[in-house]
Amino acid sequence: SMNRILPNGCLALVDPCTEVERDGLPYAVCVNGYDATIKRVRKLNNGFVLEPDSTDPTYQSKVFNFNEPDTMAITIIGRVVFYVLPTDWEF
């Protein structure tokens, strides 16, 4: 879901932080305490938008508005600052 900036299978280096310091940058986030993902994150007044950066149009942004009672919890793990490709990755 992030193949425009992070090739599939790459290893991401995450700088730990607990807040979104700059809107639109890629962050590692945990959704509902279980699922971890990397997405571009934008802050809302009371929530977040997780945006894919993909060539595949089936990946869509997800809005997490904490004013709505059934919204899943979002935990910011950190900002993605670098990535590397595995040694067995083929071009």
Give the residues covered by each predicted segment:
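Acidic/glycine-rich C-terminal interaction modules and beta/coil loop segments
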Residues: S1-F91
